[in-house]
A protein has these predicted regions:
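N-terminal helical cap/lid subdomain that shapes the substrate entry/recognition surface
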Residues: 4-75
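Short, flexible active-site loop motifs that bind/organize anionic cofactors or intermediates
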Residues: 14, 67, 93, 120, ...
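Asp-based, Mg2+/Mn2+-dependent phosphohydrolase catalytic module
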Residues: 1-5, 9, 78, 82, ...
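Short, acidic loop-to-helix structural element flanking the phosphoryl-transfer center
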Residues: 65-93, 127-128
Length: 177
């Protein structure tokens, strides 16, 4: 059984523990509305996405104006983390992508920081990152479960190295990004 093997559970943050994408979607709607005389909403969204992607290595993920937005846990998150903590069986680690300052502030604002043994912020989540952390934690990947909304960056890498993935999809507007 999975629960008997797992020693460490990694949680993604944005759109797994709290809503984040909705704020980006709203900002994009305002952006395309303000600039509609220069192109269609699709053209403007594509241009914005390309610019954000190009800036990501330098500026990180997301606009700094989003640093003050709420990070309200989804229903059931606190109850789930409480239950996992009370078992005493698992080390809970928050591993998320993004800007270090932004993620640290969101975890603090969410009130969930008390549940996590460690908070790790990375720019990319993939096989290498999961292997590196499994070595630091002195736990084989076969004893790690990852809970996240992105199959590509949260779930697939851990499965490929023998761990467990718990996919919680989140697409508030049916988006694909």
């Amino acid at each position: 059984m999975m629960k008997d093997k797992v020693k460490v559970i990694f949680f993604d943050a944005d759109d797994t523990l709290w809503d984040n994408q909705t704020y980006f979607d709203r900002a994009e709607e305002v952006f395309t509305e303000e600039l509609k005389e220069y192109g269609t909403a699709e053209e403007l969204s594509d241009a914005l996405y390309k610019t954000e992607s190009a800036n990501m290595p330098i500026l990180g993920y997301g606009a700094k104006s989003l640093l003050r937005l709420p990070a309200t846990p989804f229903p059931g998150v606190v109850k789930t983390l409480d239950a996992l903590e009370k078992t005493g069986r698992y080390r809970l680690i928050l591993m998320t992508k993004g800007d270090m300052l932004d993620q640290q502030n969101k975890i603090r604002r969410s009130g969930l920081d008390k549940y996590f043994y460690r908070v790790i912020v990375v720019t990319i989540k993939g096989i290498k990152e999961y292997l590196d952390i499994s070595h630091v934690e002195l736990v084989p990947s076969s004893q790690i479960a990852v809970v996240g909304n992105s199959f590509k960056s949260d779930i697939q890498p851990i499965i490929e190295i023998g761990g467990y993935g718990i996919h919680i999809p989140f697409t508030p507007c049916g988006g694909t990004r």
